[in-house]
Design a protein with these regions (language model features):
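Transmembrane beta-barrel wall of Gram-negative outer-membrane proteins
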Residues: 1-105, 117-122, 126-140, 144
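Face-selective signature of the C-terminal outer-membrane beta-barrel domain
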Residues: 79-101, 125-267
Length: 267
């Protein structure tokens, strides 16, 4: 892609004149290059320490946050019993909880193809954030008929696990990439109806007989993230189809294809 812009060669040569840690021999090689292809091997030379000093950075600025995730959680629960006769009562219990988490991925260094330095000149540390919601409620009626204890109840619960990827990018989008993506959700719900019978056995002390019925429904779903979070885009900004020629793929300065999807966790 870079060969398509004839201005780039001149811009690089002009900028090289302003870099004070390039010696005269190296500058001469850059000025003598007649194409981007001739510049590519020259600009792979390692100037890490000099460039860090020029940018006012240290190696610690490229550290990962391993085992240092943050967490915020809230919970609310209720428990209630309402007697309505000598032997029968209504009951209910349940709650709602919410948890937000944030963890870091691997640092994307500026010399990697998965980093578009036009947006992240110093690389970046992508963050995986999660929003987890849990809800549950149980309600029932229980009591006695003769020596039998009877309990009829219904329990409903659901969970949603949503991913948002922040401080990241879809490298194949170049300058058009956002820095935050909806990367999808996982959902689960369950509903259970129970009817239980139990009574003590008169012939055996501390022994009981019990039986019951249960009906359970479960549902699980995976919700895809937004298209920007998983698609790879071509040089025109459209979704790159499978089998597309390499000439349609976005590349970095050195000709490496730029990956699609949100870095650290595509949707």
């Amino acid at each position: 892609n870079v060969d398509a812009d004839p201005r780039l060669l001149g811009l690089i040569k002009g900028y090289a004149q302003e870099v004070d840690y390039f010696d005269s021999s190296y500058l001469s090689q850059i000025q003598g290059a007649t194409s981007i292809a001739a510049l590519q091997p020259l600009l792979k030379k390692d100037f890490t320490e000099q460039e860090l000093a020029y940018r006012g950075l240290g190696r610690k600025d490229f550290n990962m946050h391993v085992g240092q995730s943050s967490l915020l959680g809230t919970q609310f629960f209720i428990n209630a019993v309402i007697p309505f006769s000598q032997h029968w009562e209504l009951y209910a219990f349940g709650g709602q909880s919410y948890r937000y988490g944030e963890a870091g991925g691997f640092f994307r260094r500026p010399n990697q193809a998965r980093t578009f330095t036009g947006l992240h000149p110093n690389g970046y540390l992508p963050k995986i954030t999660t929003d987890i919601q849990d809800s549950s409620i149980s309600a029932g009626i229980r009591g006695e008929v003769g020596k039998w204890h009877i309990d009829l109840s219904n329990t409903f619960g659901r969970n949603e696990f949503a991913y948002t990827i922040k401080n990241t990018g879809n490298t194949s989008l170049l300058f058009a990439s956002p820095d935050s993506f909806d990367a999808g959700k996982l959902r689960f719900l369950q509903n259970t109806i129970n009817l239980d019978f139990s009574r003590p056995l008169e012939l055996f002390e501390k022994a009981n007989i019990s039986f019951g019925l249960e009906q359970r429904h479960e549902a699980y779903s995976t919700v895809a993230g937004e298209e920007l979070s998983y698609a790879t885009y071509d040089i025109h900004g459209g979704v790159l189809p499978l089998g597309a020629p390499s000439s349609q793929k976005t590349t970095d300065f050195f000709g490496n294809s730029l990956p699609g999807g949100a870095q650290v966790l595509p949707g």
